Amino acid sequence: MVKYIKLDERAEVKSSFDRFKQFLHRTFRGELFIGLWVVLREMLKKNNSHTILYPMEKFELSDRYRGIHKLLRLLESGNERCIGCGLCEKICVSNCIRMETTLGDDGRKKVLNYSINFGRCVYCGLCADVCPELAIVHGGDYEFASEQRAFFGFKKDLLTKYDELKNQKEFTGFGSLPENVDDLIKLTPTVYTKKVDENV
């Protein structure tokens, strides 16, 4: 059991030499030299830099990093993936997503305007998790300083450009589909009936 020492039971330091000895004892303990040895050892190791030269070098981020949002396109056709369901707007906890839709000529929803207020966004990732088409994802861009508090990202800024479409990669973070997804999908009944008709 630990016995606590009352302050007045301690040995009283009387002379200045005793104070100096107490100072040396408290300063030069073993922990100080252990810490100095760790710092010196890490400093003298080659190719063991813990810092990067920021403007020239960029940090490699995880696929799960939640940076500035991106609106992806379909790789085959280049059309927008967003179907205008509005789930991202409904689930947004900071109420920063705005979407305007209209019915197109084919009777499907078309997204007219899509904006995100990055000043209000808390980058929780709920919008990307709830998206049924994986149209909105978080990118790896973390350099988005702005002079205004309300900094909006609009559809034309978030959507993948046509000339960059060949470089667009499928989202590999949380909620993405596995690479062998085609092997895991079961055939629909219409495919089965077509196969039966072909065999007859």
From Swiss-Prot:
Disulfide bonds listed in the record: none
UniProt enzyme class: translocase
Taxonomic lineage from the root: Bacteria, Pseudomonadati, Campylobacterota, Epsilonproteobacteria, Campylobacterales
Residue ranges constituting the 4Fe-4S ferredoxin-type domain according to the UniProt record: 73-102, 112-141
BP terms from Gene Ontology: aerobic respiration
Record protein name field: NADH-quinone oxidoreductase subunit I
Compartments (UniProt record): Cell inner membrane
E.C. number(s) listed in UniProt: 7.1.1.-
Cofactor note: Binds 2 [4Fe-4S] clusters per subunit.
Keyword field: 4Fe-4S, Cell inner membrane, Cell membrane, Iron, Iron-sulfur, Membrane, Metal-binding, NAD, Quinone, Repeat, Translocase, Ubiquinone
GO molecular function, one term: 4 iron, 4 sulfur cluster binding
Annotated positions binding [4Fe-4S] cluster 1: 82, 85, 88, 131
